[in-house]
Amino acid sequence: MLPRQLCIEVTETALIDHPQRTREELVALRDAGFRVLLDDFGTGYSSLNWLAELPIDGVKIDRSFTATMLEDPRRQALVAAIPRLAAELDLEVVAEGIERTDQWQALRQMGCRLGQGELFSRSVPAEQLGQLPAVLLPAAC
């Protein structure tokens, strides 16, 4: 696999604990060709500042939002805002925790083009990655 085919996920906790060191490491990873995503976006100490200043390629919408968005209009509004904001910043968006077709359809209508969850596949052990169809690998972040 090429570095560009892999995503490195960084959590906000890592950023808070060691912001300068983490930033330097993210720059090095991106320079090496890896894609970097901010994981669990919307939870913890989410800050729009991270989106503006970090060398990242995208964000991952936390499953706590996608799991309840269809039943909670406020969460749905928050989820819908993330792809719009990301598009303005030229960032990709991955929605986590997609278990049902109606969730995926709603996310697609909101502008989310990548997703993870049991709707697509259960977690796969590293030794079985080579057995996945090639079409799944680019969106596996």
Language-model regions: role of each:
Residues Q5-Q20, A32-C141:
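EAL-family c-di-GMP phosphodiesterase catalytic domain
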